[in-house]
A protein has these predicted regions:
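N-terminal signal peptide c-region/cleavage motif recognized by signal peptidases
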Residues: 12, 17-19
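Polyanionic/metal-chelating signatures
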Residues: 122-125, 130-259, 387, 422-427
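Bacterial N-terminal signal peptides that target proteins for export
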Residues: 1-10
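C-terminal cap of metal-dependent C-N hydrolases
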Residues: 30, 34, 41-44, 368-411
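His/Asp/Glu-enriched, well-ordered alpha-helical/loop segment
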Residues: 93-95, 100-104, 111-112, 234, ...
């Protein structure tokens, strides 16, 4: 089943006569997966006007006169893919510290650190991600020695300087082994620090009038944690072990005002029923099927399948190389299908479900009033050999070039023995 998208659509239908005066694109002859109760529409025409979906219907009759027409040639059309956990745009070269803004190990601050302040929309990883069909990315900071990693963002992959959609989308907190090591050496220490931090944030600024330090946070971090501590901002909790996830569920029941989602969740299937009852979403990587640590001994390729079957709100991410390979979220979804996840559920897990988790209104579906993030494919989007032919972000047809494709085109046609461009043989 595809989870219902909680969004408010614009009332009324747009008249075809009014389409011509706006920027209009019509994608015809498409197998369109809508992400709604409408399901997959064969021989569909998708009409986009001024950055929004205006109509989805069968057949090509009555197209707007001034529409740019793209023939999908029977191929798939889907909503733009959302990568729900990555560090795209925060790192250019992993081995060069000056280009790495994922963490700040020497900083006095933790929650106050905003990934948006280091995000580069023109990083070479952004077009690499976009040309694979990913139109929106959730970008998280990395812990720099504190269980509170900082605050993440949501951006589109257009590469424009205005591509950040939400520069303060969530707070990332690491529990389990990582939280224990960063909070004093044990899980109880991590939970004690979290409770103290919530108290500091909820009593800000009163308890800081005479002092700069609270029980767990500085004045600056306590102020930054305030919205999340009051349930006004999402808290992403990184946890893998079943007992750690169970503790998060119990903590959420104790603090009903908090908005919590799990990221990681390698053993989440063991507590799937509890997660479903608590309505706590989980972001998992279907690739994670081996016990990389003692908190992942129960990792299995059927984690995603078991979570979805239990009714857990489940999204997929690729976490193996989160700085450069957010695009592989599609391969993760394909692996989930290979291990029993329904094809519709897998597509939902990388479109409508992450939009729901991160509160992205009118995103992740193809229906009237939705944002026109749309991808045209040359095959099944979850097949590893398929690729996009067109990527639209807010109704704009995007460049399908990246640094890698330019290098390919530059050198692929060299004659045998020919020197690369910018190199000349000596006379």
């Amino acid at each position: 089943m595809i989870p219902a998208k909680l969004s408010t659509l614009a009332a009324g239908a747009l008249m075809l006569a009014g389409f011509a005066s706006a920027q209009t694109v019509a994608i015809t002859n498409a197998k369109t997966w809508t992400g709604t109760a409408q399901g997959t529409v064969e021989n569909a025409t998708v009409i986009m006007v001024d950055g929004e979906i205006a109509e989805v219907r069968t057949g090509e009759n009555g197209l707007p006169a001034d529409a740019e027409v793209i023939d999908a040639e029977g191929g798939w059309v889907t909503p733009g893919i959302i990568s729900p956990f990555s560090r795209t745009g925060l790192v250019e070269v992993n081995a060069e510290d000056s280009t790495n803004d994922t963490y700040a190990g020497a900083s006095d601050y933790s929650i106050a650190l905003k990934a948006a302040d280091g995000f580069n929309p023109m990083a070479t990883t952004v077009p690499v991600t976009r040309i694979e069909g990913v139109t929106r990315i959730v970008v998280a900071p990395r812990s720099g020695g504190d269980m509170f990693a900082g605050r993440g963002l949501v951006a589109n992959t257009s590469g424009g300087q205005d591509s950040i959609i939400d520069d303060d989308a969530f707070v990332l907190i690491r529990m389990g082994e990582a939280g224990a090591s960063n909070a004093g050496g044990s899980r109880p220490a991590a939970w004690a620090r979290l409770r103290a931090a919530l108290s500091d944030a909820r009593t800000f600024p009163a308890r800081f009038l005479a002092h700069n330090e609270g029980d767990a946070l500085t004045r600056v971090d306590a102020q930054a944690f305030g919205p999340a501590a009051r349930g006004q901002q999402l808290i992403l909790v990184e946890a893998h072990r079943a007992s750690d996830i169970k503790r998060v569920i119990e903590f959420a029941r104790e603090s009903t005002e908090l908005n919590i989602a799990i990221v990681g969740g390698d053993e989440a299937w063991m507590v799937a029923e509890d997660l479903a009852n608590a309505k706590i979403p989980v972001i998992v990587d279907p690739f994670q099927n081996l016990p990389a640590s003692f908190e992942q001994l129960g990792a299995t390729a059927e984690n995603a399948k078991r979570l979805i079957e239990a009714g857990v709100i489940t999204s997929f991410a690729h976490m193996g190389n989160d700085t450069h390979q957010a695009r592989l979220v599609l391969q993760s979804a394909g692996n989930a299908v290979a291990n029993g996840v329904d094809h519709d559920d897998a597509l939902a897990a990388i479109t409508v479900v992450p939009a729901l988790i991160f509160g992205l209104e009118n995103v992740g579906t193809i229906e009237p009033g939705a944002v026109a993030d749309v991808v045209v494919w040359d095959g099944d989007p979850l097949e590893v050999m398929s690729a996009p032919t067109h990527v639209f972000i807010n109704g704009q047809d995007q460049s399908m070039e990246s640094r890698q494709t330019r290098l390919r085109d530059r050198y692929l046609g060299l004659e045998a023995g020919g020197a690369p461009f910018a190199y000349k043989r000596s006379e």
